[in-house]
């Protein structure tokens, strides 16, 4: 027998003690707050790791993921054991509803909240949303003391974490309270919200931590067990097919039940494995030689070597070749699965369903007879293995038991964005949790771009006290804004509503010189007003000088009195001696003294409403780019004011590509995009012209650095550009190719998830819809 296996079996050998209580059935002898458990001379540590998009990856990407996962298995320490566990946790319905449903506020919007909650509950009743999957890696090692074990775990955990990061899977170490929570949620399924454990308080009172996690009762039968009011059964993979598909583990864990599937792995040092295989091959060759000698003695000189001997020789040679030339390792593994049900009948039905999945893959999943207690301890992420049905596998053969399926987006306090196409789970994202909350919504006309923004806007309006501001160049947002009790401000050349382009709140520069930032804004504004040509160096200097002179008295007066206007700026230009100043003044005269001077007057608009929309559709082609820029600067002033009040702000900019057509306006937007994150604001840009957007280097940078993107149906040229920019695989691109309304991809942080959204056609839907017939009905 291989020395490593012999040593492992010897070390794992335990003295059997009949448990006298349910607490005794939990084999943890001692634990430390950092999450290390002790069982005899064995210590264990658990990491939780996130899922990755394996199921929807292209063939090339799957191969790359498979090889990266194989490298992780190859890197496992030969002096320790590893357990990979997939945990299906039934979501507590009451807790889940409390987390996602919008509470009543006894105001005029409660009717919409009721409709929104009904929509969410319609999605939640789908069985897939009642189970949440978690994945763990448990490392266990025999050491003389916890200090030695801790040193070992520090080294190995760092290596495992870095290799998981290479797979885009993020991991975290579980402390003792979190590890015990996993056990509590399994042993006391349905009572997840009742978990309360303070280790210091337990020690002070002299209580055992096992009291907080153990079930009320635990009775083991021949092929199942009864735990409290639940029935359970432990199965193990008894027979393996010669070829197993990489989807088998995902299919087994796809059952909508409380279950845990664990893969116990014992790595073997390569030198030992090679020596063992060489001895095995020598034994097979000896058997072949002896057989041929017997045939020769019977004068049978043409006899063919028996099939079984030939197969043994072939398989041994192949495995030896794998180890010596293909960087494979020999590993011992056993797969165990424990599942729970509410009744014996349901348990038997679930067992048959699991066995049917295994049979489909030409494998045999069998219940453990009279070993249910040992099997339960083995299947849980404790770090123990009491089942000896080990199978010799190479790295490749073990990597086929792939624990990855699809990424999920489920943030605490997240907003609903649709359902994951792969798992059918709700996508709940909290943009405030991301490195920056800014984002884009991209899609061709009719793909659901505006609807997506309005759905998020409505959810925020109904569930938070955050301020919401829209810049609407198409007059599409009026129904939803007014329906939610907001204010729509019409701005045009003939409108009585005016916004001063030179408004400046105290704190505009965020501790820096506010005139510098305002100068950049006026440079971008003048560039827009002067047409397609770029400003010369002289003109830039003149504009900067005039800006400082306009604001000198206002800032020295403590931001009191009349705010300068574009008329003041125009007059200041005329006072300059340079002829270039008069050229700039003449170029902007139409917008200061002429018929398009709506932004050259003092602000007379009340913008204090929590939900505000600037309707700029009637500005016309001449004023629209300038109008978007001025409104954006006004919004920035509002964001600064909200920051002082400790209030978050959400900004939606439709047809954002218009701002990227000129260098200075693009740079102003880029600066704003970076600054608002510090002020507790999130900006969202919407456009159907992705190709036009990406012509701007600034826009490409903003798009590539955005943590949140919603990509709906895309034109072919846009798909190619997005694929290059965001490294989207061909398989993922299929989710934004000729798809229906409300379908696409969501990029949230590092996760890219295919989604779909079927919103019921209620009153809230009619407020959000931009389809003419439905919009008319809402009106």
Please report, for each region that a protein language model flagged, where it lies by residue.
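Conserved P-loop NTPase
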Residues: 726-778
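A short helix-turn-beta junction within AAA+ P-loop NTPase domains corresponding to the substrate/partner-engaging
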Residues: 485-489, 698-711
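Conserved lysine of the Walker
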Residues: 449
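Extended, folded cores of ATP/NTP-driven motor/assembly subunits in large transport
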Residues: 1-406
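P-loop NTPase motor domains
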Residues: 52, 59-78, 89, 253, ...
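Hydrophobic anchor at the beta1->P-loop junction of P-loop NTPases
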Residues: 441
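Hydrophobic positions on the alpha1 helix immediately C-terminal to the Walker A/P-loop
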Residues: 452
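Post-Walker A helix-loop "phosphate-sensing" segment adjacent to the P-loop in P-loop NTPases
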Residues: 459-469
């Amino acid at each position: 027998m291989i020395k490593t296996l012999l040593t492992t079996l010897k070390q794992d050998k335990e003295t059997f003690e009949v448990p006298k209580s349910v607490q005794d059935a939990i084999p943890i002898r001692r634990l430390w707050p950092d999450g290390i458990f002790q069982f005899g001379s064995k210590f264990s540590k658990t990491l939780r790791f996130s899922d990755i998009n394996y199921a929807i990856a292209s063939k090339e990407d799957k191969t790359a993921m498979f090889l990266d996962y194989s490298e992780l298995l190859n890197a496992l320490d030969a002096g320790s054991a590893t357990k990979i566990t997939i945990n299906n946790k039934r979501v507590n319905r009451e807790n889940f509803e409390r987390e996602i449903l919008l509470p009543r506020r006894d105001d005029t919007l409660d009717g919409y909240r009721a409709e929104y909650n009904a929509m969410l509950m319609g999605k939640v009743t789908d069985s897939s949303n009642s189970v949440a999957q978690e994945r763990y890696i448990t490392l266990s090692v025999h050491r003389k003391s916890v200090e030695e074990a801790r040193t070992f775990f520090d080294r190995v955990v760092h290596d495992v974490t870095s290799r998981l990061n290479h797979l885009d899977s993020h991991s975290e170490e579980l402390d003792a309270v979190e590890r015990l929570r996993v056990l509590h949620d399994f042993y006391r399924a349905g009572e997840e919200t009742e978990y309360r454990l303070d280790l210091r308080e337990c020690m002070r009172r002299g209580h055992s931590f096992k009291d907080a996690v153990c079930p009320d009762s635990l009775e083991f039968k021949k092929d199942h067990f009864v735990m409290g009011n639940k029935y359970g059964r432990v199965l193990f993979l008894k027979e393996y097919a010669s070829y197993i598909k990489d989807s088998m583990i995902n299919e087994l864990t796809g059952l909508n039940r409380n279950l845990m599937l664990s893969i116990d792995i014992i790595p073997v040092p390569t030198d030992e494995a090679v020596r063992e295989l060489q001895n095995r091959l020598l034994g097979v060759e000896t058997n072949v030689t002896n057989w041929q000698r017997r045939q020769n003695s019977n004068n049978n000189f043409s006899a063919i070597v028996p099939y079984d001997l030939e197969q043994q020789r072939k398989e041994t040679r192949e495995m030896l070749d794998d180890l010596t030339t293909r960087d494979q390792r020999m590993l011992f593994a056993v797969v165990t699965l424990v599942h729970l049900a509410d009744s014996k009948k349901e348990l038997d039905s679930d067992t048959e369903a699991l066995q049917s999945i295994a049979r489909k893959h030409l494998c045999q999943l069998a219940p453990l007879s009279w070993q249910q207690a040992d099997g339960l301890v083995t299947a849980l992420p404790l770090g123990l293995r009491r089942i000896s049905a080990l199978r010799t596998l190479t790295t490749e053969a073990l990597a086929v038991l792939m624990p990855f399926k699809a990424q999920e987006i489920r943030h605490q306090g997240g907003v609903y964005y649709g359902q994951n196409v792969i798992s059918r789970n709700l996508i709940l994202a909290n943009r405030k949790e991301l490195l920056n909350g800014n984002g884009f919504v991209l899609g061709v006309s009719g793909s659901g771009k505006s609807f997506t923004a309005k759905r998020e806007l409505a959810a925020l309006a109904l569930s938070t006290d955050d301020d919401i501001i829209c810049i609407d160049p198409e007059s599409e947002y009026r129904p939803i804004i007014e329906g939610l009790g907001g204010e729509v401000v019409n701005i045009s050349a003939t409108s009585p509503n005016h916004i001063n382009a030179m408004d400046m709140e105290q704190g505009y520069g965020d501790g820096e010189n506010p005139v510098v930032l305002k100068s950049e804004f006026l440079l971008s504004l003048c560039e827009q007003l002067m047409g397609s040509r770029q400003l010369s160096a002289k003109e830039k200097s003149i504009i900067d000088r005039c800006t400082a002179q306009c604001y000198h008295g206002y800032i020295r007066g403590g931001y009191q009195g009349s705010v300068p206007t574009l008329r003041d700026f125009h007059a200041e230009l005329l006072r300059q001696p340079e002829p270039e100043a008069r050229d700039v003044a003449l170029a902007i005269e139409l917008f200061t003294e002429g018929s398009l001077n709506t932004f050259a007057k003092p602000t007379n608009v009340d913008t204090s409403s929590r939900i505000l929309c600037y309707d700029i559709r009637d500005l016309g082609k001449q004023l629209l780019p300038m109008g978007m820029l001025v409104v954006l600067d006004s919004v920035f002033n509002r964001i600064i004011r909200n920051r002082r009040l400790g209030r978050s702000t959400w900004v939606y900019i439709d047809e954002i590509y218009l701002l990227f057509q000129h260098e200075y306006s693009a740079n102003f937007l880029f600066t704003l995009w970076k600054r608002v994150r510090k002020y507790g604001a999130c900006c969202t840009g919407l456009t159907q012209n992705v190709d036009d957007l990406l012509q701007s280097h600034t826009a490409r940078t903003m798009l590539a650095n955005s943590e949140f993107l919603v990509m709906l149906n895309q034109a072919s040229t846009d798909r190619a550009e997005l694929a290059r920019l965001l490294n989207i695989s061909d398989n993922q691109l299929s989710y934004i190719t000729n798809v229906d309304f409300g379908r696409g991809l969501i990029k949230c942080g590092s996760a890219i998830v295919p989604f779909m959204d079927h919103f019921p056609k209620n009153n809230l839907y009619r407020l959000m819809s931009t389809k003419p017939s439905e919009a008319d009905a809402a009106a």
